[in-house]
């Protein structure tokens, strides 16, 4: 999953797809969606990153058409760097203006959750906004699993394969088999907890 996030000092709790469409599609200044009106405090990722691609699809703004400041300080390559950038605004009087996107796995680190908070997201056609988790303080991804939270995408794994079409590392092949439903034998054998 992916998050829209702001600084812990912000009073904002949620963002709608319509608001995100305007802020990222028109640009913060032109969108006039308070408090996200200052381009200096709105952060995204490069257009090639899955975070921006997935969120872009959900807000109907293609990743390459986001209106962000065209510099590395606002189109941040790594989610961890983006998290640090937003977290650094803790004592800034403009903390409420901060808005960024990042992977939930980065946001979920306790050091990041202490300095920023995820915004609940209300998708087009929804009546309520949801966090990826059941609440803003849990880590269960309940709303992703039950379909309420749409900001996520599939993950692809790449690995070298031999002429037999199997992964060249046995451990990797075991994981692939387990994920795809192929028969798997674990050594040592284990007893599944959900028989």
Residue ranges and their predicted role:
Residues 1-195:
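Flexible loop/hinge segments at secondary-structure junctions
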